[in-house]
């Protein structure tokens, strides 16, 4: 799990990893706290080992969050070869797993 702290780090992450999932969250966000353990658990599952997991605090890296079009937290975005492939707004564990399955299959 990578904690992204700058736009440069985010861009490098997308350039150097084929598949990436990003959790755009905020420390004050209740639903973000509820889904965090599930996101962390998914990052350790064998079927997702080819995917790089990252977290961005929208208050600490607002430029990346704004560029990504984040309107609510949590928002999960998936990327393949630097291009956005999917998005999930909200803290639904079943939908998060479905999003991960879609990225893992690509």
Predicted regions mapped to residue ranges:
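The canonical Cys-X-X-Cys-His
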Residues: 29-32, 76
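Typically the conserved alpha-helix immediately C-terminal to a functionally engaged Cys/Sec
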Residues: 33-47
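Non-catalytic, surface beta->alpha helical segment in thiol-disulfide oxidoreductase systems
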Residues: 72, 77-106
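Mid-chain, well-packed structural core segment of small domains
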Residues: 62-71
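Conserved acidic residues
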Residues: 57-59
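Short pre-active-site segment immediately N-terminal to redox-active cysteine/selenocysteine motifs
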Residues: 18, 25-28, 72
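N-terminal leader/targeting and pre-domain segments
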Residues: 1-20, 98-106
